[in-house]
A protein has these predicted regions:
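Short, well-ordered strand-loop elements centered on a beta-strand within folded domains, enriched
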Residues: 69-76, 143
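Conserved phosphate/ATP/ADP-binding segment of small-molecule kinases
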Residues: 1-72
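Conserved post-catalytic alpha-helical subdomain immediately downstream of the catalytic base
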Residues: 51-53, 77-142
Length: 143
């Protein structure tokens, strides 16, 4: 991964991928692999980002984090009763890319991606929400 870091703008991973990378790099002994704790999520993403020398976005059940190896930022997930078990990570990644392309700052980007995935997983149908629906959801649920 270090050899590719000059070619990668950002690495987007989920909690299972994060745990696998930490284990593959023998970094799990330095921190807890319990990614149901905000501080552990922040430490994990910062550790991997520092190790690989690239920015990392990490999305988990409890929220999303970003790090460049020095700084780290975390945004909580929205509470949603899941109506399906697959696809939320793909929706999160798609929203994250859109947010990068339109120039949202890190907090806005993670918030938008969390909202988009939450809307998707909270619906019975397998169609992703619209951008407008995600914006409306944030305005109604974010404090």
């Amino acid at each position: 991964m270090k050899k590719l870091s000059h070619s990668i703008d950002v690495l987007s991973i989920n909690e299972n991928e994060c745990t696998s990378l930490l284990k593959a790099c023998n970094l799990e002994s330095r921190l807890s692999l319990d990614l149901n704790d905000i501080e552990n999520v922040k430490k994990a993403v910062k550790t991997l980002s520092s190790e690989f020398g690239l920015k990392i976005d990490l999305h988990t059940r409890i929220g999303a984090a970003w790090s460049d190896g020095k700084d780290v930022l975390f945004v909580n997930s929205f509470y949603t009763v899941p109506k399906k078990l697959t696809g939320s990570g793909d929706c999160w990644d798609a929203a994250d890319l859109v947010a990068y392309f339109v120039g949202l700052d890190t907090t806005e980007r993670l918030l938008f991606s969390n909202a988009y995935a939450s809307l998707y997983i909270g619906r019975r149908e397998f169609e992703p929400p619209t951008i407008a629906e995600a914006v409306d959801f944030i305005q109604a649920h974010y404090q």
